[in-house]
């Protein structure tokens, strides 16, 4: 008889791991501490609640985010299926209605007889079970202490922040206009509301942003560590006055229909749900105090009367030093029955969390049935992500998104042949990845 299997955390990684185990005929227990113990960032007790953006990144073929999602689809990811059901317009990105998405995942998990959902907090990991730790960036203190004890290391962290959401009816559409950058959209529609700023408006906005009161991170400012792909706008502005308009406020590919010209800067709003009743400010994660957010963000033309349904917030993300601890199968070298998945393993991004959850579920199933977990080939995005998690330099381990830099390079002859065609190089990498994935699928069936 195999050991019982427990999964800690009902987020993206934990729910995907549970589903993969159930698909292989294995019973498991999924522990989610909400609502018994709430977190600073979650609003509901639903599984797989998205607390930051509602975008699962690019669906443009032969990009790294597309490749990772395509591999997940081919391995029957539950969460990618739910994302498709909850999809809303989002340009070339897979964007979801976060409420529908969480409801779909919760319904699927609770309806699966092989998954037992317990609403409780886990603070210790017994030796007589297989564990998948997918407790996320907001891991509770007692569990974090247990993980530190098991791994013999202290915690690592960085600070992350979430974007504000505004009521759609409060946006002035006589100023804001619908468009996708360069007209790019998966279905040919204009998926973003765009708020233009001229140079004077932009300079005034930056001045007020830099003066705004922020919520204390509770540690000295010079010790604060942010994930570079999700910087608060205040931090971006501190790096230079024009940094914002070359980042989240870049105007490229967006001409104001009122003037026929490109604005000095643009703030993009992306719809939050299918009914387009609310919008999030794309890339506008911040940790200004709430009254300051209202004051400063209402300086943006089109948002002068904005009603905020959610303000930006900052929260601390926790992750282990995975390269010093984990194998490419995402389990501890010293305790092979304990797996890690999601952001606590040191990946950053929704799809990356789903990916590590899926792989941890597959590998835990192999271990539970007496087989040796078999990591994916390095040629795949999934394999490369797990290779990074287990094989990066442990001295300076930083969370990673999926990029082509993580995948193996093409041979020198192929690089030379396609040196002037990056799209063709990426397409070839994707082709080889999917071929390797198909071989892996046939081998593990």
From Swiss-Prot:
Tell me the Gene Ontology biological-process terms attached to this UniProt entry.
tRNA methylation; tRNA wobble uridine modification
Which reaction equations make up its catalytic activity?
Answer: uridine(54) in tRNA + (6R)-5,10-methylene-5,6,7,8-tetrahydrofolate + NADH + H(+) = 5-methyluridine(54) in tRNA + (6S)-5,6,7,8-tetrahydrofolate + NAD(+); uridine(54) in tRNA + (6R)-5,10-methylene-5,6,7,8-tetrahydrofolate + NADPH + H(+) = 5-methyluridine(54) in tRNA + (6S)-5,6,7,8-tetrahydrofolate + NADP(+)
Gene3D superfamilies, A to Z:
FAD/NAD(P)-binding domain (3.50.50.60)
**UniProt GO cellular component terms:** cytosol
What are the required cofactors?
FAD
What's the domain of life for this entry?
Answer: Bacteria
**What does the UniProt entry say about where the protein is found?**
Cytoplasm
Q: Which HAMAP family match?
A: TrmFO (MF_01037)
Know the name of this protein? Methylenetetrahydrofolate--tRNA-(uracil-5-)-methyltransferase TrmFO
Organism of this sequence = Solibacter usitatus (strain Ellin6076)
Gene expressing this chain:
trmFO
């Amino acid at each position: 008889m195999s050991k019982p299997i427990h999964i800690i955390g009902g987020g993206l990684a934990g729910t995907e791991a549970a589903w993969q185990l159930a698909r292989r005929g294995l019973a498991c227990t999924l522990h989610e501490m909400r609502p018994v113990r709430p977190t600073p960032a979650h609003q509901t007790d639903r599984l797989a609640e998205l607390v930051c953006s509602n975008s699962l990144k690019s669906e443009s073929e032969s990009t790294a985010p597309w490749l990772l999602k395509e591999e997940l689809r081919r391995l029957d990811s539950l969460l990618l299926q739910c994302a498709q059901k909850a999809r809303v317009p989002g340009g070339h990105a897979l964007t979801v209605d976060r409420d529908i998405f969480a409801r779909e995942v919760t319904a699927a998990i609770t309806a699966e007889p092989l998954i037992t959902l317990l609403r409780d907090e886990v603070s210790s990991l017994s030796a007589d079970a297989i564990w998948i730790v997918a407790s996320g960036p907001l891991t509770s203190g007692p569990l974090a202490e247990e993980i530190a004890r098991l791994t013999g290391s202290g915690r690592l962290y960085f600070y992350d922040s979430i974007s504000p959401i505004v009521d759609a009816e409060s946006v002035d559409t006589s100023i804001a206009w619908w468009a996708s950058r360069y007209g790019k959209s998966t279905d040919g529609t204009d998926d973003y509301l765009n708020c233009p700023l001229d140079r004077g408006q932009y300079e005034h906005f930056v001045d007020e942003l830099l003066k705004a009161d922020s919520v204390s991170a509770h540690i000295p400012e010079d010790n604060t560590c942010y994930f570079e792909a999700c910087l608060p706008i205040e931090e971006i502005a501190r790096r230079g006055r024009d940094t914002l308009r070359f980042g989240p406020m870049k105007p490229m590919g967006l001409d104001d229909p009122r003037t026929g010209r490109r604005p000095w800067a643009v703030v993009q709003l992306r719809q939050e749900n299918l009914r387009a009743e609310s919008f999030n400010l794309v890339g506008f994660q911040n940790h200004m105090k709430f009254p300051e957010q209202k004051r400063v963000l209402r300086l943006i033309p089109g948002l002068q009367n904005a009603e905020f349904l959610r303000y930006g917030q900052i929260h601390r993300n926790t992750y282990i030093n995975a390269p010093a601890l984990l194998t490419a199968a995402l389990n501890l070298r010293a305790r092979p029955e304990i797996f890690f998945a999601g952001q606590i393993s040191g990946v950053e991004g929704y799809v990356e969390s789903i990916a590590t959850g899926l792989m941890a579920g597959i590998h835990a199933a192999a271990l539970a049935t007496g087989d040796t977990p078999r990591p994916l080939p390095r040629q795949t995005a999934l394999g490369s992500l797990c290779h990074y998690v287990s094989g990066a330099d442990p001295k300076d381990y930083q969370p990673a998104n999926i990029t082509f830099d993580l995948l193996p390079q093409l041979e020198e002859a192929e690089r030379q042949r396609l040196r002037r065609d990056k799209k063709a190089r990426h397409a070839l990498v994707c082709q080889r990845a999917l071929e390797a994935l198909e071989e892996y699928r046939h081998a593990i069936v």
